[in-house]
Design a protein with these regions (language model features):
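The feature marks the mature, well-folded catalytic cores of soluble enzymes
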Residues: 1-322
Length: 322
């Protein structure tokens, strides 16, 4: 499985469709997804998947160079429902894992349970179905054999209760071409929707080199959780760069974190969720020091995406270049 920071042939995003999670702000979420697609399209090709009834609205909101296609979906978190791509013997393969709505929390999910294979068929990609529950946001790889994930998510009984930790690690390595799994204990404290996805706390930017989300407020549960994760990563031999500030927002009486770490690395740029926090400029500059060869772009869509339960990384999926 190539790293996210390797070259892409394109990015795939979905048009928000689940009004239950956004309520009266669904249109705002749709605008945010379009803004992200339009930004990424300045660096690489982008496809926007939309329900047939939303096709016109999506096309009107997206730039002309964004390809909008009609495929039925329940929700818009394509990082989790979409395929994880591997390259084997020079051939691109879409690995299509079992999707169960994040432990059957969000129903219905029958359309999202098949979107990986339907998208791959539309794109003409070879597929491999895998009988194990997995979301793409629960892992990250460095492209050199190391995969990072969280115990909180992958060992949760609502995912694969009959599989042991070792069995899960073995399956990840065999299907995604990895040599080892680094198990972080935690996701973020308020990440109840996904049970602690890794893409809120860790992102590889090089071989055995990872950026990790920290927290500078000792009164937050994430202060100790992030510190423990960082310690575990260092003990695993990883070079760790820390983003020390973790913003929180309250939207419609719901409190959520907006981690800078939930960024997306596309060709020649890093797109970062921001929410008007005092530290936004400083943290974007820090990311520029960690990743000096790419443009660092902050998009102020972090708050609305957090209302839906995720961030920029959660709604994107890269297709590796061959």
């Amino acid at each position: 499985m190539p790293a996210e920071f390797a070259r892409h042939s394109q990015t795939v995003i979905c048009w928000p469709a689940r009004s239950e999670i956004y309520g009266s702000r669904l249109a705002e979420a749709q605008t945010a997804h379009a803004a992200l697609a339009n930004t990424i399209s300045g660096y690489e090709p982008v496809t926007m998947i939309a329900n047939p009834q939303d096709l016109t609205a999506a096309r009107n909101a997206c730039a002309e160079n964004v390809d909008v296609v009609a495929l039925e979906i329940d929700d818009a978190w394509f990082r989790d429902s979409g395929p994880n791509y591997v390259i084997e013997s020079g051939e691109l393969i879409a690995t299509c894992w079992t999707f169960n709505g994040w432990g059957e929390k969000f129903v219905p999910f029958d359309k999202d349970a098949t979107i990986a294979t339907r998208w791959a068929a539309h794109a003409g990609h070879k597929t491999r179905k895998i009988n194990m529950v997995l979301e793409g946001g629960s892992l990250n790889v460095d492209g050199a054999g190391t995969l990072i994930t969280t115990e909180q998510c992958l060992l949760h009984p609502n995912r694969n209760p009959k599989l042991s930790r070792d069995q899960i690690a073995e399956r990840l390595c065999s299907e995604l071409g990895q040599q080892r799994v680094v198990w972080l204990p935690f996701g973020l404290a308020l990440d109840d929707d996904t049970d602690g996805h890794a893409d809120n706390v860790a992102a590889f930017i090089g071989e055995k080199t990872v950026i990790m989300q920290g927290c500078d407020d000792k009164n937050e549960a994430d202060f100790s959780r992030c510190a423990t994760n960082i310690s575990v990563a260092k003990d695993a031999g990883l070079t760790v760069h820390e983003i020390p500030v973790l913003p929180y927002v309250v939207t419609d009486s719901v409190r959520a974190a907006v981690p800078y770490l939930n960024f997306y690395i596309c060709n020649d740029a890093v797109i970062v969720p921001v929410c008007g926090h005092d530290a936004d400029s400083e943290m974007l500059a820090l990311l520029g020091e960690f990743i000096p060869d790419r443009d660092i772009i902050g998009l102020e869509i972090g708050e609305i995406l957090s209302r839906g339960g995720g961030g920029i990384h959660c709604i994107t999926q890269q297709i590796p270049a061959i």
